[in-house]
């Protein structure tokens, strides 16, 4: 899980979602693409 000021999709499988006011990226194909904004 990367914590970044700005989260971006890194591949076409990445999805940007918002959980409890926190913007996150989840990726089914590449778990290393997981990010959260903070």
From Swiss-Prot:
Keyword list (alphabetical) reads:
Ribonucleoprotein, Ribosomal protein
Gene Ontology terms: biological process: translation
Is-annotated flag, keyword rRNA-binding?
Answer: no
Q: Does the keyword Chaperone apply?
A: no
Q: Which GO terms describe its molecular function?
A: structural constituent of ribosome
Gene Ontology CC terms: cytoplasm; ribonucleoprotein complex; ribosome
Q: What family is this protein classified in?
A: Belongs to the bacterial ribosomal protein bL36 family.
Task: List the protein's name.
Answer: Large ribosomal subunit protein bL36
Instruction: Give the species.
Output: Stutzerimonas stutzeri (strain A1501) (Pseudomonas stutzeri)
**Species lineage, top-down?**
Bacteria, Pseudomonadati, Pseudomonadota, Gammaproteobacteria, Pseudomonadales
């Amino acid at each position: 899980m990367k914590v970044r000021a700005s989260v971006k999709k890194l591949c076409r499988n990445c999805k940007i979602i918002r959980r409890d006011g926190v913007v996150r990226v989840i990726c089914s194909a590449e778990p290393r693409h997981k990010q959260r904004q903070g």
